[in-house]
């Protein structure tokens, strides 16, 4: 069975969908969820789903090789950033080339980069008068949201859409597409 490790900073709704999806199809298991946020909803979700969850801080991630060594011991087939807000250190990217994927709530390269996450993205998209938005699943590199694009899917922005309504549309895409694309990557 293939092994996934997830990183998440927030609510964990995408992480939960991934765990549930792979429990049903048994191609892979989520061996561990890592979070940098002691108040993240993903902690409660991991507990409820009986998936090991570990909290780490900036020192563990950037100043020591603690997280890198943990990942090397676990030997995941894929590392999935599911709402993880920190930039991944270059030593981890170098050790796991084309094995770290992220999901972003816009059609990159638009509305990507530092500070562009969650509702910030949807507010910027609506403020700019865009007619469509969507999701991008991509490999990560040393720059925010600039890695090779694996998959994109669009949603139409209709007159009167608010950032909150756009967020709902984008979440629906994320929940459906992210596990399927992860599955395809594991099978390739």
Task: Label the predicted regions.
Residues 1-188:
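One-carbon transfer enzymes
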